[in-house]
């Protein structure tokens, strides 16, 4: 079994750019950014429970990493960058810390490196279970209307929230709930030490209005790019800013 993905081929000899979307997104999420890099071959992945991979279920991050590796092999991707947003960024960091063959580097936008104590993990588990129950049982428009009121999305205006609620409500609530629980921050290890000891290139992007993740970025041994005029979802709010940062990263 492999993950559903869309592949776009570029020039031979350059590494692939493998894009991983955030929770409730799909393979289209990164394409406005990715298509600015037509020289590179691009793979836009649907994570389990999402888009064309909605029927694929996992028990945890190890399953996701295994599926991602099988997917890369199926496309004969031997050299690649992982580029992930939020959940996709956490998947990228988890996979990269398992020393993937062929990995050139990781670019994470607004991805959490992991909670640092049992109390935080217990609180997050309670929260994610409550959200998962809502995703399973309530209309998605109602759930996402509340989802986008969370503090991390404070920089969104009303029009942006309405647009996101309409877009995300096309998902399957049950499969979102399953993926939310399987990849909860409550079950993700703290990756700070692994990332500090890494052997791969590591870059971190965050919106200038995303105070939570700017603070987290400061804790990581990563080259951080702050995206102007953007909050947590920087590649959606300022795609040109993210394109500029990614172009700078890939030039090294």
Curated annotation (Swiss-Prot):
Annotated GO molecular function terms are:
2-succinyl-6-hydroxy-2,4-cyclohexadiene-1-carboxylate synthase activity
The UniProt keyword set, sorted, is: Lyase, Menaquinone biosynthesis
Q: Does the keyword Lyase apply?
A: yes
Q: Which residues cross the membrane?
A: none
Q: Which reaction(s) does its UniProt entry say it catalyses?
A: 5-enolpyruvoyl-6-hydroxy-2-succinyl-cyclohex-3-ene-1-carboxylate = (1R,6R)-6-hydroxy-2-succinyl-cyclohexa-2,4-diene-1-carboxylate + pyruvate
Tell me yes or no: is Lyase among this UniProt entry's keywords. yes
Pfam families in the cross-refs: Abhydrolase_6
- What does the subunit section of this Swiss-Prot or TrEMBL entry state? Monomer.
PANTHER family from the entry? 2-SUCCINYL-5-ENOLPYRUVYL-6-HYDROXY-3-CYCLOHEXENE-1-CARBOXYLATE SYNTHASE (PTHR42916), PROTEIN PHYLLO, CHLOROPLASTIC (PTHR42916:SF1)
Protein's name according to its UniProt entry: 2-succinyl-6-hydroxy-2,4-cyclohexadiene-1-carboxylate synthase
Organism name: Escherichia coli O6:H1 (strain CFT073 / ATCC 700928 / UPEC)
